């Protein structure tokens, strides 16, 4: 199928698209902001028009689509444990008016924690957007080591996590609970009660394309299970594990919030943990 798409694209070009058609805020954020940030971090080291890229935790593939359409990427293979990317042709049609997605994109579903390097090697660049906080803690090192083996010498890896667990909305539950740091002060039962009782519309930018699959109540259960499974890594721990996996840190940015810390949390956690909302890393393979 891939060769047929490439032949069609060679004859007809990439399907026309129009960003003025975008109506979905989740799509807009990942098509614009996420893709621009990934391009900024990868594009300083790689020519995306020539690079072979792998996206670990690609989700619905919207950011990959934008990297092709807006930033000239020509080869991105997305990997995920779910099949949200299967919706991308429909999403691209609805949000951009595209008749088909670019042949530069390919996707694959994997079993959690399964090794990749045996069949995926020689990549120029890797990216991972808000994925590693969901990886089982004792699997972070072997997965990073496996991704290191997927990368060619001199290749780079853009890794981002937001929000980090100890930050104000590190629970990933903000669509239902807007109280900063509530997850560090309340019991799981109290948190679940808050979510379960939530009524009314959600922030459109927080509603992904999987919401309809679960329904309102099912989605509440899904995101709460995701919260319970968070590995609670700090930025320092992530960097230390990345180095253990063989990476060197080429660039690092930590973004912090400026807001009062609740008295109940003062002294319980380092202030930097509580304020550090996001970590962005460019890792290199020597």
Model region roles, listed by residue range:
Residues 115-126:
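A short acidic, Gly/Pro-enriched loop at the edge of an enzyme's catalytic core
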Residues 50-59, 158-203:
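Conserved class I S-adenosyl-L-methionine
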Residues 245-247, 266-286:
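Core SAM-dependent methyltransferase catalytic element
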Residues 141-153:
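A short glycine-rich, Lys/Arg-flanked "PGG" loop and its adjoining helix->strand segment in the class I
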Residues 229-246, 252:
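Short alpha-helix
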Residues 6-46:
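Class I SAM-dependent methyltransferase Rossmann-like catalytic core
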Residues 61-115:
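Class I SAM-dependent methyltransferase SAM/SAH-binding core
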